[in-house]
Amino acid sequence: MNRSYSLKRHKEFRYTYARGRSQSASLFTLVYARSRNESVRVGFSVSKRVGNAVQRNRVKRRMRAALTPMIGEISGGWNVIFIARPEVLDAPFAEIGKQMESLLRRAGLWRDEA
């Protein structure tokens, strides 16, 4: 995933959590809020409940890899945060991508539905 799509600053995460809406599934919670940018900005949050540092970083890498091919399908002008749940550790890669797409569609952030 290109760096320009990344949500990095604590201030951006706080803004998205405070003003955002959410959708939930078994592997993730999606929090999304309108942003001033024209492009979509995506962040990933994996708490210590998910596992040790190695497991958390692996989950973030898998989430980024699953989202990369779909980044062009997400409507611009949004801050999006995917919050991982512990179940994501045992989930197959295909299921991760499927649930991410499903959450984005339910939130109305998928291009053909926005």
Residue map of PLM features:
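Positively charged, solvent-exposed patches that mediate nucleic-acid binding
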Residues: M1-A114
